[in-house]
Amino acid sequence: EQGDLNIALHGLHGDAPHLVLAPNGVGDCLQTTRWAVMLAEQLQAPAIVLSDQFLGQARAAIDAPADPPLAGERARAAAGVADYRRYALTPSGVSPMAIPGTPGGAYTADGLEHGERGTPSSQAADHVAQMAKRRSKLELHDYGELWADVDGAGELAVVTFGSCTGPLREALSQLAGTAPAMRL
């Protein structure tokens, strides 16, 4: 439903970067979820996987899923770092994360804006720097071949997710030649 999509895209507190993914059918659910977990680990950002009632209750015979090497590798901080900065400004936008209990890896985590060490800050410079960092990690990441499932050619595109994908694919094939070319 459109409302679900709007909440997933815009329903978080503040300007927090997050990922929204959706399977296109029953056979795509496992791969989409694996990819969401991998991206959440790599980008240190929440990932939302959209589904719908039909996909959740469907029974289908599908091919055994491939076991692709989707490994979410965290940027980890070295042990014993003297000046650990949990939210360090890095070229990739992803800061090294200390495993809990790592010597020298303590930091403050709360819901307020902060500087590189995690200390809450109301300074405009800290806010601007951290917002740019959050944006850059989504923009600079290589999402690979799974980024989007786009079929067709044309200037118009129909965006869909979940169980609506099959009927829309069929409708576009029936419109072929009678309507402007569209992508799905």
How would you label these PLM feature ranges?
Residues 1-15:
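Flexible glycine/proline-rich, aromatic-decorated loop/lid segments
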Residues 14-22:
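Short beta-alpha connecting loops at secondary-structure transitions
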Residues 25-26:
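A generic structural motif
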Residues 32, 37-184:
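Flexible, low-complexity linker and terminal segments
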